[in-house]
Amino acid sequence: MKCKITNEQIKPFMSFGKMPAANGFLKEKDFKNETFYNMEVGFSEKISLFQLNKFSNPKIIHSTNYPFYTASSEHMKTHFKKYAIWIQKEYLKSNSKLIEVGSNDGTFLKNFTTTNIDYLGFEPSKTIADQASKNNVKTVNAFFNDANIQNLKKFHNKTDVICAANVIAHIPDLKNLIHTIEKLLSQKGVFIFEEPYLGSMFSKTSYDQIYDEHIFMFSVTSVKKIFQLFDFELIDVHWQKTHGGSMRYVVGRRNKHKVNDTVHKWIINENKNKLDDMESCLEFKKNCETSKAKVINSLKKMKNDGKNICGYAATAKSTTVLNYCNLNTDTIDFICDSTKEKIGKFSPGSHIPIVPVSHFHKNLPDVAYLFAWNHKDEIFSKEKEFLNKGGSWFSHVSL
């Protein structure tokens, strides 16, 4: 495989086997047409970048019915409100210009609708962009790229902040992304983005962060090296609790900003923990294999003991777990979810029925596999009755 930034040849260090599209929830009639790919991961030692070998076409992924709305999570709504307040305090002033990449249903940008900030969101999924527009959030239904910004002259070289959250790892052509940012940012403008953190994935063995839409897993070291190639520099970082451990990166034009000491401290820490080294990748591979065996054996014992098991939350991440561990309806009876686009369909590859959360409440199992472990606090507070009636939670990561 080739590094998607440097074009160097890199050797995959691990295969997760045959995988379907992570968000490819489907009807029974479509089982026979389901497609799979061999999901392998590699590591560029030149720029310390963890990356996927193959990925789905973003135009297909973000088609009309992309099944995720940010506003469905109270936790994320709170997080984005705090994110908006922080950006306003640190980087915006009266009449500043702001663009969000992958703005979803407008949950983040809604915080700017009553300000004098000149903002705009880019959202490629039509149904989600339409929802943002219904929420009176200014949104362009398009991918954020060089071709789609040509008519936005008032933002060219005048944008104070370009931001994104859990989006950049989904974009295969980072070069085009950075060139687009370069055209829009003012001389002292900043690009701020949040993504799940490689170090957190390694420490938790949360391999379900890897699927066809998550093309990259970033570290502070890799972000620094990538942007240096394009005359930008990493000027600040902030660790976040979201998604099991994420990092907020702040990037600016070279020599236009003071670089915060936290960047240097994180790079020293990553070097100490060998996040910039293939050795950590091979250790992660070993830990994944151990985790897989533990999941299979634990669930098998539960079934042998007569336990009823369901899945909670039909996440994209669950597709990796279910297919990597070869789980299906022999083990998991159903998966409950609140997303209407998924209910009545089946999980990709494993073909477990997706049912509404009300079905979970009416048919409380003995064990619930929490696939949305990164939202555990919000879910635990909603599902106290499950525990009170003797149920227990299970996951491949520590809860």
Residue ranges and their predicted role:
Residues S94-N104, I309-Y312:
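Conserved class I S-adenosyl-L-methionine
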Residues D105-N116:
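Conserved SAM-binding loop of SAM-dependent methyltransferases across substrates and taxa
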Residues D160-C163:
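A conserved beta-strand element that flanks and buttresses the S-adenosyl-L-methionine
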Residues K175-V190, K384:
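A short glycine-rich, Lys/Arg-flanked "PGG" loop and its adjoining helix->strand segment in the class I
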Residues K188-P196, S392-S398:
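Conserved beta-strand signature within the Rossmann-like core of class I S-adenosyl-L-methionine
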Residues F193-F216, V220-S222:
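Short, glycine-/aromatic-enriched active-site segment of Class I SAM-dependent methyltransferases
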